[in-house]
UniProtKB/Swiss-Prot annotation:
Belongs to the HMG-CoA lyase family. Keywords: Lyase, Magnesium, Metal-binding, Pyruvate, Transferase. Pfam families: HMGL-like. It comes from Chloroflexus aurantiacus (strain ATCC 29366 / DSM 635 / J-10-fl). Residues 4-281 form the Pyruvate carboxyltransferase domain. It catalyses: (3R)-citramalyl-CoA = pyruvate + acetyl-CoA. Optimum temperature is 55 degrees Celsius. The gene is ccl. Optimum pH is 7 (at 55 degrees Celsius). It is an enzyme of class 4 (lyase). Its EC number is 4.1.3.46. This is (R)-citramalyl-CoA lyase. Activated by dithioerythritol (DTE) (in vitro).
Amino acid sequence: MEAVTIVDVAPRDGLQNEPDVLEPATRVELIERLLAAGVPRIEIGSFVNPRQVPQMAGIDQIARMLIERGHNLAARTTNDLFRFTALVPNQRGYELAAAAGLRHVRLVLAASDGLNRANFKRTTAESLIEFSRFALNIRRDGLTFGVAIGAAFGCPFDGYVSPERVRAIAEHAVDIGAGEIILADTTGMAVPTQVAALCRTILDRIPDVTVTLHLHNTRNTGYANAFAAWQVGIRSFDAALGGIGGCPFAPRAVGNIASEDLVHLFNGLGVPTGIDLSALIAASDWLSATLGRPLPALVGKAGPVYPQVVSMAPYLS
C-alpha cells in the first residue's frame, strides 16, 4: 500500500502555545528524538518576532546546533521532500531562515481576513501580494517553499470560509512557485465530509504539488478527518508529538492531532509511515516529563494494538 508522509510540527506549532519556553538545546533534543523514531519531515520552528511568540526564540541557534550535530538541513526524504522546514510569516522571516541554512520554508497566511488580521495585521489579499514579491527572492536563492493556508475549513472570527476562496488561494500560491500546499484546520472546525470535498478539489486542481493536511483535534474530529482525507488521496499529514499545540492568535486552537495516534491509525490500516511507533511513544513520554504534564495523545496511555504496519489482506478477502 502507498506510504504516507507525516510531518511532525511539535517543535513549532506544538510548542508555540506552551506557557513555558523551552531552551534551544531541549528543542534540539526533541527534534533528534523525532528523527531517531524515523519521522521523515520536521518543522523545526518559526522565524517570527520573539516578542510576539517567545516560545520560538532562538530558532537560528537551533538550526546552527543541528548543523553542528551533523544534521544536513538540505537533506531530502525518500520521496524527494526536504526533511527540515520552518515557518516564515514575511520577508524578514524568510531572510533569517535562509541565513540559518534552511532549504525549504513554509509561508503562512489565513484564508479568512479575520484570522489573517489577528495574526499578521493585514488582509489575506495583502499577504498574497507580499508572498508574490518575496517568492521571487526564494526562487532566486534556490530554496523551495510551501504555503500554509490557515482557517481553510472555517474561521473563529469570520465563521464560514468558502472552498472556492481556499482553492483560489492555493492556485495563486502554486502560480508563484509553491511546491506544497498545507490546508490547515486551525481551530478544529472541520468534519470529514467537508475535508474530503475540499481535499478532492485541491488535488484535482493542483495534481503535481504536494498537498499536506494540518489538523487540530479541538472537537475530537481530527482522526476521522485524517481518514477521510486519506481516502480521497491525501498522502502527507502534519501532526504533533503528544498532540500538543495551538495558535496564540486563534481562540480555542488547542491540540494538533498526535503523531503517535496517527501512526497507530495508519499501522492498523496497513499504510506504511516509516516511523517506529514504540520509539515515538517513548519520545512522547519524554516530552510529557519535560513539559511536566500529561499530553493529549492516547495510544501511549492505552497501549498500541498495532505496533507495526499490519497486512489488511484478512479484512479485504
